[in-house]
Amino acid sequence: MKPSIHSLTHQTMQEWVLEQGEKKFRADQIWEWLYRKRVQSFEEMTNLSKDLIAKLNDQFVVNPLKQRIVQESADGTVKYLFELPDGMLIETVLMRQHYGLSVCVTTQVGCNIGCTFCASGLIKKQRDLNNGEIVAQIMLVQKYFDERGQDERVSHIVVMGIGEPFDNYNNVLNFFRTINDDKGMAIGARHITVSTLGLAHKIRDFADEGVQVNLAVSLHAPNNELRSSIMKINRAFPIEKLFAAIEYYIETTNRRVTFEYIMLNEVNDGVEQALELAELLKNIKKLSYVNLISYNPVSEHDQYSRSPKERVLAFYDTLKKKGGNCVVRQEHGTDIDAACGQLRSNTMKRDRQKAVAAVNP
């Protein structure tokens, strides 16, 4: 199975062309064809020699993903189900924001973290995506608009799809390098956000990288007992260890951390929890920001329901009165398979049912 050409960073592209006996500037030409002109085949790279095109075809594919399903919401959200070369499925989501087009990418096939409210963890991790498969998600979303003649460009990226990005650390870093490169898509690092469920040691590593990509942490509870009950990762990285890493990140980078907090009715959404959260954040409140997120129900997790508006507002008001920076996040795609991993999970379920029906007509 040939890798995607998108697996090469600009530096490794330069190394590759030199290994082929070509001049270094050929890497810039290939890069421009891929990311500025966004061609779908090597044959379209008309300023390359036939010999170099043959070598590219022999060693790489341009697009490693196949589009299976596209769901479009009334609010402009678009959800894509892509098939990988090995037949596995991943999701990507485009969201229209007031500041531009934001794409949420997947970094793993399945997830081993096992959050009890999440559709992504219904299917255990099968493998990591390589950086080319992550880059290809952005390129196919951009292609979706290019083909419709819509003069719109992906401007922001959130690494919050299926999987734990910091469990696929090196591929995710190479994805940042490729998509941020000023000769390519040139998406600014500060327009990219990576979200972790709380791998404390990787947060420290990320602080030391010196990249300008934004950091978000999926917190979802203000104390160890509650967080461990809904996120098993808290047993390995309890809040004390997690916040020591977050404080190290802030001290090292002087950059703000966003905390994601999904609102689960009568589980973590009470005024008591809001007060606990305010206390937890009191030493870093100038460089912290809380996103209060409405829960998208998942049939397999029917013990949870979304918090009613009055509980969300009471939580928000309590946190604000304590000096916390917070916002109730805008919802997207509520009329389609909105929850992370839901489209993939539902499609796999239907595929299994069809397979059983074919065997037992």
From Swiss-Prot:
Any single Pfam family the record assigns to this protein: RlmN_N
Catalytic residues of the enzyme: 91, 340
Binding site residues for S-adenosyl-L-methionine: 163-164, 195, 218-220, 296
Keywords: 4Fe-4S, Cytoplasm, Disulfide bond, Iron, Iron-sulfur, Metal-binding, Methyltransferase, rRNA processing, S-adenosyl-L-methionine, Transferase, tRNA processing
GO cellular component annotations of the record: cytoplasm
GO biological process: rRNA base methylation; tRNA methylation
Chemical reaction(s) catalysed: adenosine(2503) in 23S rRNA + 2 reduced [2Fe-2S]-[ferredoxin] + 2 S-adenosyl-L-methionine = 2-methyladenosine(2503) in 23S rRNA + 5'-deoxyadenosine + L-methionine + 2 oxidized [2Fe-2S]-[ferredoxin] + S-adenosyl-L-homocysteine; adenosine(37) in tRNA + 2 reduced [2Fe-2S]-[ferredoxin] + 2 S-adenosyl-L-methionine = 2-methyladenosine(37) in tRNA + 5'-deoxyadenosine + L-methionine + 2 oxidized [2Fe-2S]-[ferredoxin] + S-adenosyl-L-homocysteine
Main subcellular location of this protein, as a coarse class: cytoplasm
Record bears the keyword Iron-sulfur: yes
Cofactor note: Binds 1 [4Fe-4S] cluster. The cluster is coordinated with 3 cysteines and an exchangeable S-adenosyl-L-methionine.
GO terms of molecular function: 4 iron, 4 sulfur cluster binding; metal ion binding; rRNA (adenine(2503)-C2-)-methyltransferase activity; rRNA binding; tRNA (adenine(37)-C2)-methyltransferase activity; tRNA binding
Record's subcellular location: Cytoplasm
UniProt signal peptide: none
Disulfide bonds: 104-340
Chain residues that bind [4Fe-4S] cluster: 111, 115, 118
Function as written in the Swiss-Prot or TrEMBL entry: Specifically methylates position 2 of adenine 2503 in 23S rRNA and position 2 of adenine 37 in tRNAs.
NCBIfam families named in the record: rRNA_mod_RlmN
Record's protein name: Probable dual-specificity RNA methyltransferase RlmN
Annotated organism of origin: Streptococcus pneumoniae (strain Hungary19A-6)
Gene that encodes it: rlmN
